[in-house]
């Protein structure tokens, strides 16, 4: 299913251009190490931007990190192709519209911000004084971090994620027991959802750092995938299970996305979005709710969601599904002998396992 990043995907794609392991990043690091500055403009077609490119000289040569480094010794800006395969111009003067607002102070960075806003293209500024790489794209600005800082930040975040994932799994396991006993409260559901939202929010906050790490972030990407595998799917199914009114998968995904972008949503706000009219958090323990059964059908019995809709439409709740015989289940469209037994046996097996734990 997947969720949107807190950092826009279009910006993440541009951050990838300057991640460690790329030729462009190698050149930028060399420029910083030599205590140079640089202003680099990435374009699709240089002829489109002749009104903002003045002076300098036309090269139209293949890109290499070494060439870019040598050209940065000159005072003017450098114009590259967007795919970083060509160097079009060197030592040019970039002249964006001076009326475009900018929050920057240095000349190089003011030019970069205005040009990115005016053209919607990537402009990279390297500060000679502060040894910082800044990427401007449209109205966005992203300051590139040092690799050591990124590794430290990502390592800490993954350690935190491991704890959150353990807690989330524990809450899910407890919820399963309550579901099978038909004594789930709204508080149980909200607590589980909140922990899942927090987990995915941390993931989206560190994702740009992992992208920025490039080749250095391969291990972190693997750990992140392992820690978050199916979490968003589980949360969507929980929302579908416990919304007061029936909701489609797409609606549940939108609800999930909304909560991930919020800062620490309250139990009350989660309850209300699920459709429950509660005024105080203490009320959540008094509201009994029943799962529809989507999560169990998909994750335990391995029933496709399209067929799961039919099962829920007939039996309404997980409690009723668990009481249905194989023959009853076979009356559902899309459920034959094999799937009926899969549902019945998976519920029985789960009950037995939870009882013996």
UniProtKB/Swiss-Prot annotation:
Residue ranges crossing the lipid bilayer per the database entry: none
Keywords for the protein's UniProt record, in alphabetical order: ATP-binding, DNA damage, DNA repair, DNA-binding, Magnesium, Nucleotide-binding, Nucleotidyltransferase, Transferase
Record-linked InterPro entries: DisA, DisA_sf, DNA_integrity_DisA_N_sf, DNA_integrity_scan_DisA_link, DNA_integrity_scan_DisA_N, DNA_integrity_scanning_protein, HhH_motif, RuvA_2-like
DNA damage keyword on record: yes
List of residues binding 3',3'-c-di-AMP: 76, 94, 107, 111, 128
A GO BP entry: DNA repair
Consequence recorded when altering residue 130 to A: About 90% loss of c-di-AMP formation
Entry's cofactor comment: Crystallized with Mn(2+) to trap in the pre-reaction state.
Coiled coil residues, start to end: none
Enzyme class per UniProt: transferase
Catalytic activity: 2 ATP = 3',3'-c-di-AMP + 2 diphosphate
Molecular function as annotated in GO: adenylate cyclase activity; ATP binding; catalytic activity, acting on DNA; diadenylate cyclase activity; DNA binding; hydrolase activity
Source species, domain of life: Bacteria
Domain DAC: 8-148
EC number of the protein: 2.7.7.85
Cofactor: Mg(2+)
Description of activity control: Inhibited by 3'-dATP.
Keyword flag Transferase: yes
NCBIfam families: PRK13482.1 (NF010009)
UniProt note: domains: Consists of three domains: an N-terminal globular domain with diadenylate-cyclase (DAC) activity, a central helical domain and a C-terminal DNA-binding domain.
Similarity annotation: Belongs to the DisA family.
Quaternary structure annotation from Swiss-Prot or TrEMBL: Homooctamer.
HAMAP family for the chain: DisA
Protein task: Participates in a DNA-damage check-point. DisA forms globular foci that rapidly scan along the chromosomes searching for lesions. Has diadenylate cyclase activity, catalyzing the condensation of 2 ATP molecules into cyclic di-AMP (c-di-AMP). c-di-AMP likely acts as a signaling molecule that may couple DNA integrity with a cellular process. This rate-limiting step is the accessibility of the active site; mutating the possible exit tunnel (residues 128-130) increases product 2-fold despite Arg-130 being important for ATP-binding. Does not convert GTP to c-di-GMP.
The protein's name: DNA integrity scanning protein DisA
Lineage of producing organism: Bacteria, Thermotogati, Thermotogota, Thermotogae, Thermotogales
